[in-house]
Amino acid sequence: MAAAQEADGAGSAVVAAGGGSSGQVTSNGSVGRDPPAETQPQNPPPQPAPNAWQVIKGVLFRIFIIWAISSWFRRGPAPQDQAGPGGAPRVASRNLFPKDTLMNLHVYISEHEHFTDFNATSALFWEQQDLVYGDWTSGENSDGCYEHFAELDIPQSVQQNGSIYIHVYFTKSGFHPDPRQKALYRRLATVHMSRMINKYKRRRFQKTKNLLTGETEADPEMIKRAEDYGPVEVISHWHPNITINIVDDHTPWVKGSVPPPLDQYVKFDAVSGDYYPIIYFNDYWNLQKDYYPINESLASLPLRVSFCPLSLWRWQLYAAQSAKSPWNFLGDELYEQSDEEQDSVKVALLETNPYLLALTIIVSIVHSVFEFLAFKNDIQFWNSRQSLEGLSVRSVFFGVFQSFVVLLYILDNETNFVVQVSVFIGVLIDLWKITKVMDVRLDREHKVAGLLPRPTFQDKSTYVESSTKVYDDMAFRYLSWILFPLLGCYAVYSLLYLEHKGWYSWVLSMLYGFLLTFGFITMTPQLFINYKLKSVAHLPWRMLTYKALNTFIDDLFAFVIKMPVMYRIGCLRDDVVFFIYLYQRWIYRVDPTRVNEFGMSGEAPTAAAPVAEAPPAAGALSSAPSPTTTTEAAREEASTPPPSQAPQGPSSASEPQEAPPKPAEDKKRD
């Protein structure tokens, strides 16, 4: 189930990234003692992987980037005796706009990436005079921020998937950004930055239909576009908010020593060596769900541009968050999924109580430790396991079948490469477990197609000769009475009410959906074996404890971060199964000093086992019995009939004595 849940989360991310919804538009805000190996049995099938945990791992990765950048700043500026290209020492630069510089803001909107038409009044979107560099108290809300809203009349080229750019110029007071106005233009008094404000996103279309009727609920226009442009179409999308930040920073940067990703924003003048004020286009809080496609039905587009000062520390945070993923070589599909994961993080930051969010991040670190320990104990358990008593071997085979179904499903749905690799590794681990629960040999006499050796599978003797196989077969026979009718009902429902690409896709999606919904039932055979054996001594409780704790942490994530209802129900039902394990541990208590039904004990073996004491020989000296021993002996003598008179002699000491009967509690356990 772990791989199934992971692929389900990744698949939904890809579908969501495919199209933008014209939902409600929001304004762009600034947010601001370990048992021996032979006593450890098989664990139940893997639990569903927490999709929310993937989100938290993304947060931790970004925290690491921020820490790395902050660590660089704590080192102080680079030494000034570094040699430059010409052999001259590099010196620290300064900001071309000193503190409290009076400046003007000019914002132009254009279809062209390089803007030159300063005389076109239609291109001028916003002009703000007399701004003070480093002023944090002006503006409508006394926070140094200003904003401007207007409707943009878009040309036909933009309606037909063209690009649109925003060009921002900051000039010192009294100067103009147009280089053709020689008297009013100064190169060192003008800073310019431009950016494409529309965003191209992939919209995927899968041609599906009802396999019985041949009908589909897809939009006819979408079907036509899929026939014209193929299953993947790149469409321009729009978000009406963008923030222009000017960083209030006067750090003596040294050219060539600015660390990434900050180096792409710090621009140096080639002549003076000083750097221009840092302009940053901030769209971090623009959620993907608020983007909508641009088409010919839109004659105008709303645009709200905000201007705010930004501190150096917050700029480092935004730059680290916006840095490109190191996995960009894996394809653009990973970018789209990364955008969706970042949206989950942003929603959690905006909608979750800060204390609860901090607690969640702390617990997530504990989750990662438990996840690693559970995986390590699982591998160690199967690698060192010699006996299969008490283990459900059929559950291992069912896990392999389940992993193969998930792998074929994600391949059929073209999930991104990272998920495919992770699921494939899970399949290899499940296949390796088969070699630990069965004797696998290669028959080189009867080859497949006369070329490849034929693999043969045979049950291990420790499994066949024990009662575990009988109980395992019985458990799966009872389980089939439930699973097969449910599978048939789900197959009929999927065929009647759902759409599919073809019969192959229907089989995979039906099996995949069935495993997601009812796969937890396959955890019950181990419970049944425990019940029939009246023992849990064979279970690896350390690994089960790690998995149980992780499941409870999953519950926290599922209710803190937005998750589908079925995922939350899945976490709850896994909790129920673990509580049943705990209940069995309570009613089938294990005495660590008692040898269980498999001939194993929880105590470490000693060099010499204790033997029954023989009666002392005649004339031998013995110590006086303690009062407790005397009392117990008196009680035993009173509760047993007097033995028949036997001749006393030295030979009686060597006769074997009958072992005392087991207590009633031990009989009940047996």
UniProtKB/Swiss-Prot annotation:
The keyword Phosphoprotein applies. Keywords: Acetylation, Developmental protein, Differentiation, Glycoprotein, Membrane, Phosphoprotein, Transmembrane, Transmembrane helix. The modification Phosphoserine is found at residue 601. Its main location: membrane. Residues 1-16, 609-632, 646-657 have a biased composition (Low complexity). The chain crosses the membrane at residues 355-375, 391-411, 417-437, 478-498, 503-523. Signal peptide: none annotated. One of its GO terms (biological process) is regulation of T cell differentiation in thymus. Residues 2-354, 412-416, 499-502 are extracellular. Pfam families: CLPTM1 (PF05602). The modification N-acetylalanine is found at residue 2. It is found in: Membrane. Residues 1-51, 609-670 are annotated as: Disordered. It is a multi-pass membrane protein. Residues 376-390, 438-477, 524-670 are cytoplasmic. GO terms for cellular component: endomembrane system; external side of plasma membrane; membrane. Glycans are attached at residues 28, 119, 161, 241, 295, 413. GO terms for molecular function: GABA receptor binding. Belongs to the CLPTM1 family. Involved in GABAergic but not glutamatergic transmission. Binds and traps GABAA receptors in the endoplasmic reticulum (ER). Modulates postsynaptic GABAergic transmission, and therefore inhibitory neurotransmission, by reducing the plasma membrane expression of these receptors. Altered GABAergic signaling is one among many causes of cleft palate. Might function as a lipid scramblase, translocating lipids in membranes from one leaflet to the other one. This is Putative lipid scramblase CLPTM1. It comes from Bos taurus.
